[in-house]
A protein has these predicted regions:
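Transmembrane alpha-helices and adjacent helix-loop boundaries
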Residues: 1-248
């Protein structure tokens, strides 16, 4: 009769933790650069330059409508066939960055379009520089509105990093495949790996929450004020953002 036995896995705990660390590191690198790419593409798509807009549309549609596995294979095997070889970590992180960039661009673009035109015009009337209008009046409020969607996308990409095992990147799933082939304890191995992915997801959620608390102090102030008043906190997305310089 079958029974769970995790004892053969104990010697492999350092290997599991190393795979989890590589998965987390790969995700953090991809999220950082992917968010930058997403912001640039979102602004470029809104620019009144037809060629630039078309290029952004091609990039977004190509990434969003092709499998992530194929994208990794194109970068790792496709480029290698023309002499451009990359380490497995670099290829996986680059594919994840490109993927996150496309999805983040559309999420951020939706946030930018939700900023009232009158708010931007008011900032222009105050004589604010364009970079301040772009950052304080447009980007910050839009990021605050779409932050939960971005966080969910980052979590999905962390979980999709398991596909990197197909190019022998030594992340968590690749480690699991090696361990289960050594121990022949497939069920126990993948239970452990599922638990580690759950822990990684909770860590990323905690990091995202802390970052959100730091970046969006207005939301925190609204929540604390509502708590002191004994009322349910209002939706910060429905409250007009204060424009730097004193105008609302």
């Amino acid at each position: 009769m079958f029974s769970l036995d995790f004892s053969p896995l104990w010697p492999y705990w350092p290997t599991f933790l190393l795979g989890a660390w590589l998965t987390l590191k790969m995700t953090c690198v991809a999220v950082f650069f992917g968010l930058i790419v997403g912001m640039l593409v979102a602004f470029a798509k809104r620019a009144r330059v037809p060629v630039l807009t078309r290029l952004c549309i091609i990039y977004i549609e190509a990434v969003r409508n092709t499998p992530f596995l194929v994208q990794i294979f194109l970068l790792y095997f496709g480029l290698a066939s023309i002499g451009l070889r990359m380490p497995t970590f670099a290829a996986a992180a680059l594919a994840m960055t490109i993927n996150i960039g496309a999805y983040a661009a559309e999420i951020i673009r939706a946030g930018l379009e939700s900023v009232p035109r009158g708010q931007i015009e008011a900032a222009e009337c105050l004589g604010l520089p364009k970079w301040r209008i772009g950052w304080h009046v447009m980007l910050q409020p839009s990021i605050e509105k779409v932050y939960p969607a971005l966080t969910s996308q980052f979590l999905l990409m962390m979980q999709a990093s398991a596909i990197a095992s197909q190019i022998s990147a030594e992340e968590l799933t690749a480690v699991a495949n090696t361990v289960q082939s050594d121990t022949f304890r497939s069920l126990e191995t993948y239970i452990v790996v599922a638990g580690l992915y759950l822990v990684l997801s909770l860590i990323i959620k905690l990091i995202a929450w802390q970052v959100g608390e730091h970046l969006f102090k207005r939301r925190r102030a609204i929540r604390l004020a509502a708590k002191r008043a004994g009322k349910a906190p209002p939706d910060p997305q429905r409250i007009d953002t204060v424009i730097p310089g004193g105008a609302a």
